[in-house]
């Protein structure tokens, strides 16, 4: 399944040797691309480390799904702190003025974009969004993975970005975030 190639480590050895990978075109169609680094982004070193006062809850470690990683980080208010800053100022605000959380979902849409001077039209492209936060017309989309990855396939956050960017909603900014969980640590990347 080509959609499971979310890290270049998962590419077949022949692909690595030939420096090729797959670009999703939607409806089960793909295009071979020369240059793995064109579709996979290497994670940057973490520049700022924050110790968080973890408050264990009953279900926090009951399962290790990607959705649960996001739920734990959300319930601990880590996601809001990472994207919008400490949310103590929201304590007295009515709910409609507080940051909103939208949990994992899939949707289909047609995406149009340029890649290497070629117009790509991905018809009926399925997009999976692990989590979305929204506050004051700023949207943050999240992809989450368990384990240590060296890189990720850009489409995992670019397709959701393009979905919201093309929406004609009055958005001020779209932040693409990647969250990695490795045992007791969380690493956040924003693009």
Regions of interest found by a model, annotated:
Residues 1, 11, 15, 73-77, ...:
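Hydrophobic, Leu/Ile/Phe/Ala-enriched alpha-helical segments that form helix-helix packing faces
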Residues 1-68:
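Nuclease-adjacent, charged terminal/linker segments that flank catalytic cores
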Residues 42-106:
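N-terminal, charge-rich interaction modules
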Residues 59, 63, 121, 143-151:
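Short, charged/polar micro-motifs that form catalytic or ligand-binding hotspots
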Residues 64, 68, 124-126, 137, ...:
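Short, well-structured alpha-helical interface segments that form or flank functional binding sites
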Residues 90-132:
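Active-site metal-binding core of divalent-cation-utilizing nuclease and nuclease-like domains
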Residues 131-146, 160:
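Conserved catalytic cores of phosphodiester-cleaving nucleases, focusing on short active-site segments
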Residues 140, 145-152, 165-191:
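Nucleic-acid nuclease catalytic cores
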């Amino acid at each position: 399944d080509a959609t499971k190639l979310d890290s270049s480590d998962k590419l077949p050895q022949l692909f690595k040797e030939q420096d090729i990978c797959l670009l999703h075109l939607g409806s089960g169609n793909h295009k071979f691309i020369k240059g793995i680094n064109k579709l996979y982004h290497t994670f940057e070193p973490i520049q700022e480390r924050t110790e968080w006062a973890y408050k264990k809850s009953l279900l926090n470690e009951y399962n290790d799904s990607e959705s649960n990683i996001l739920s734990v980080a959300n319930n601990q208010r880590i996601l809001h702190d990472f994207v919008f800053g400490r949310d103590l100022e929201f304590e007295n605000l009515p709910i409609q003025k507080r940051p909103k959380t939208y949990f994992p979902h899939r949707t289909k849409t047609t995406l149009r974009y340029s890649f290497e001077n070629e117009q790509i039209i991905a018809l009926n492209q399925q997009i999976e969004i692990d989590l979305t936060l929204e506050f004051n017309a700023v949207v943050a989309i999240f992809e989450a993975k368990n384990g240590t990855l060296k890189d990720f396939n850009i489409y995992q956050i670019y397709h959701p970005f393009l979905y919201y960017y093309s929406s004609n909603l009055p958005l001020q900014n779209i932040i693409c975030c990647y969250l990695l969980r490795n045992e007791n640590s969380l690493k956040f990347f924003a693009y």
